[in-house]
């Protein structure tokens, strides 16, 4: 391990920079810096040499040229173990730079701003920064590169413990992280530039929805015991910039390691439960809700959701959008076996009760609004990319196509079952009343078969469908689905419409005295 004697610090994100530089100074490290970073460190009393003074060449071209100098890159790239390199560096007065701390211009934040122009974006493409990062990362055996300010405390601690030196393992890991950082940065620039239409050059609207080259960066969270089935290998990766409130932000409080299927099902449950404003419970099995309810509190919501399908709930994923108390957890553990229990927060009593079921995976997930920019689905040799289905409707968005108008209670129930249907695999039919699902028919090739399954589920659960409401995620291709619904005593239906036989479907509703509202929006889910 070689001792670090000279460091170059040039940061856009300066979090923790002063404390880190102070630690370096205590170890006798000479610090080079640029622009705002140099001012920050000097203002905090840290001795700093401006890069322009070190190279004897001023910053120029509005700061575009600061560190692009042989004395900088020679000091970073020179191999200390090659006599020829050492001799050339001595000949040209190039000293070693042993530590480089650089992060890059905030390109992502820039293009996310409303009204960002091509010129704004171009000016926030870093050139000198990535060049230094790649130089240091390439020469990792002799130079340490830090691109993440979150690493400062650990690096400072290791330097102090090793008399100013870093291990080969640390330097190699920092190098790998640095190359990933620049790859992600360049991919982001490529995504932006290739999403622009040619009209950008003439001042026309600049950015399209999808780039012509699509780059994504992911960070591995864990290797998994196996994939969807035991003979498949698998790992879980997190988006490098996940949407607020995403499942990937989970904190596991107890239980066995999450499996591939646990994560897939938990994501389905979480996306569904966070779509409700009122306290809600969603129980999921094989990525499909088998029970959903909204109520005044988590205990009542769970009881109602569980009552929809007590058989399918066994071994399911249970999600809440409110803090969960001990009474709720006790009710769950008394009722059923579960794989995962998730909520934004749990009381101390709830966690104490859950601890008795040590294998149950308990997850806290921040409850924040937000959705991924894109949804991705692999196909053979390709990738399907779409914007997420986050459409929400209210009563004013609906058109009544029946003679009978929905009652006030039916309006509420229609909106509830419609929201649930969005998270059920197509063909999806959802029956419900009073903020509780009464029957869910999922994943059938025939819509009328899904309707019959939903009816059978309600019958098996002993739930009376008289006066309930029904939702269909897509239009009814024939009137048969409406006829089956009417046989159950259901009095209101919500669906998108759009079939060639819409009028037959509307007429069937009138024949049965059913109130029918159409959304004009479909919610297929595959």
From Swiss-Prot:
The gene is purH. It comes from Neisseria gonorrhoeae (strain ATCC 700825 / FA 1090). This is Bifunctional purine biosynthesis protein PurH. Its EC number is 2.1.2.3, 3.5.4.10. SMART domains: AICARFT_IMPCHas, MGS. GO terms for biological process: 'de novo' IMP biosynthetic process. Residues 1-147 form the MGS-like domain. Pfam families: AICARFT_IMPCHas, MGS. GO terms for molecular function: IMP cyclohydrolase activity; phosphoribosylaminoimidazolecarboxamide formyltransferase activity.
């Amino acid at each position: 391990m070689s001792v670090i004697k000279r460091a170059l610090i040039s940061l856009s994100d300066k979090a923790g920079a002063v404390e880190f530089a102070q630690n370096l100074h205590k170890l006798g490290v000479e610090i080079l810096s640029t622009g705002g970073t140099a001012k920050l460190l000097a203002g905090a009393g840290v001795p700093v040499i401006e890069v322009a003074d070190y190279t004897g060449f001023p910053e120029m071209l509005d700061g575009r040229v600061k560190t692009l100098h042989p004395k900088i890159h020679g000091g970073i790239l020179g191999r200390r173990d090659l006599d020829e390199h050492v001799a050339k560096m001595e000949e040209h007065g190039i000293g070693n730079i042993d530590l480089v701390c650089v992060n890059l211009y905030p390109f992502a934040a820039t293009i996310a701003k409303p009204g960002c122009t091509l010129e704004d974006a171009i000016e926030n493409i870093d050139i000198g920064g990535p060049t230094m990062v790649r130089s240091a990362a390439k020469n990792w055996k002799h130079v340490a590169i830090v691109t993440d300010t979150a690493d400062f405390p650990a690096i400072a601690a290791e330097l102090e413990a090793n008399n100013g030196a870093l291990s080969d393992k640390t330097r190699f890991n920092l190098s790998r992280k640095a190359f990933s950082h620049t790859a992600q940065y360049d991919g982001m620039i490529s995504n932006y530039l290739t999403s622009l239409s040619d009209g950008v050059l003439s001042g026309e609207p600049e950015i399209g929805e999808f780039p012509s080259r699509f780059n994504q960066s992911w960070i591995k969270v864990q290797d998994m015991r196996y994939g969807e089935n035991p003979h498949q290998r698998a790992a879980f990766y997190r988006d490098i910039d996940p949407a607020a409130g995403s499942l990937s932000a989970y904190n596991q409080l107890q239980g066995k390691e999450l499996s591939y299927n646990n994560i897939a099902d938990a994501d389905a449950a979480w996306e569904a439960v966070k779509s409700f404003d009122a306290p809600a419970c969603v129980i999921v099995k094989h990525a499909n809700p088998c029970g959903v309810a909204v109520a005044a509190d988590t205990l009542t919501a769970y009881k109602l959701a569980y009552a929809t399908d007590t058989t399918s709930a066994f071994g399911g994923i249970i999600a809440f959008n409110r803090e969960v108390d001990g009474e709720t957890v006790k009710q769950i553990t008394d009722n059923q076996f579960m794989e995962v229990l998730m909520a934004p927060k749990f009381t101390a009593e709830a966690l104490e009760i859950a601890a008795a079921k040590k294998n149950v995976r308990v997850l806290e997930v921040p409850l924040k609004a937000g959705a991924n920019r894109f949804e991705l689905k692999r196909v053979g040799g390709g990738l399907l990319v779409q914007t997420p289905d986050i459409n929400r409707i209210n009563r004013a968005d609906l058109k009544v196509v029946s003679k009978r108008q929905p009652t006030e209670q039916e309006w509420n129930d229609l909106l509830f079952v419609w929201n649930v249907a969005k998270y059920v695999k197509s063909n999806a039919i959802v029956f419900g009343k009073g903020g509780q699902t009464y029957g869910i028919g999922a994943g059938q090739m025939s819509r009328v078969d899904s309707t019959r399954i939903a009816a059978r589920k309600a019958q098996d659960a002993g739930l009376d469908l008289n006066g309930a409401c029904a939702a269909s995620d897509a239009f009814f291709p024939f009137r048969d689905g409406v006829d089956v619904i009417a046989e159950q005593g259901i009095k209101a239906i919500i669906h998108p419409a759009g079939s060639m036989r819409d009028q037959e479907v509307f007429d069937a509703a009138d024949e049965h005295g059913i109130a029918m509202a159409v959304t004009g929006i479909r919610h297929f889910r595959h």
